[in-house]
């Protein structure tokens, strides 16, 4: 049985919470800046996976690094230290001249972290901790 874009889209609608509009495309493969859907049609990925695939899909060095890391340790909480986190934090501090970095894996975590940092900063200075946001904004 061929699993088509239409089939996957309809099945997805049965189970996936509709918090935002999804397109009736099911991408099943990526290479560089190209994507292929379930019907075999080729596309240029103009979104780069919402900017997280800035080296393209399945870049050999990224695939190798992910495979190597997954073979050692998949994930631990930020409550603990890991060698890759120490290395990338040092690299970013050295490159930017900043004192510290805060690593996250999503826009939502980045915004939540920024709010907490801003509130902590304001609290230490006995200033207001009010946060202003845009109505109906995504993050």
Place the predicted regions along the sequence by residue.
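Active-site and channel-lining beta-strand-loop segments
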Residues: 25-45
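Short clusters of hydrophobic/aromatic residues that line enzyme substrate/ligand-binding pockets
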Residues: 27, 55, 138
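Conserved PLP-anchoring active-site segment centered on the Schiff-base-forming lysine
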Residues: 121-139
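A structural signal for well-ordered alpha-helical scaffolds and beta->alpha junctions
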Residues: 5, 9, 59, 85, ...
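Short, flexible segments with low predicted structural confidence
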Residues: 6-7, 37-38, 63-64
């Amino acid at each position: 049985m061929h699993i088509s874009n239409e089939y996957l889209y309809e099945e997805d609608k049965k189970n996936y919470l509709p918090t935002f509009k999804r397109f009736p495309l099911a991408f099943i493969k990526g290479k560089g800046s190209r994507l292929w859907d379930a019907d075999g049609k080729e596309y240029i990925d103009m979104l780069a996976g919402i900017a997280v695939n800035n080296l393209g899909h399945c870049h050999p060095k990224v695939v190798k690094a992910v495979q190597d890391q997954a073979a050692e340790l998949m994930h631990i909480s930020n409550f603990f230290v890991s060698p890759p986190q120490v290395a990338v934090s040092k690299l970013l501090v050295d490159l930017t001249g900043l004192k510290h970095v805060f690593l996250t894996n999503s826009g939502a975590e980045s915004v939540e972290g920024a709010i907490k940092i801003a509130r902590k900063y304001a609290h230490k200075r006995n200033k207001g901790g009010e946060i202003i946001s845009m109505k109906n904004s995504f993050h």
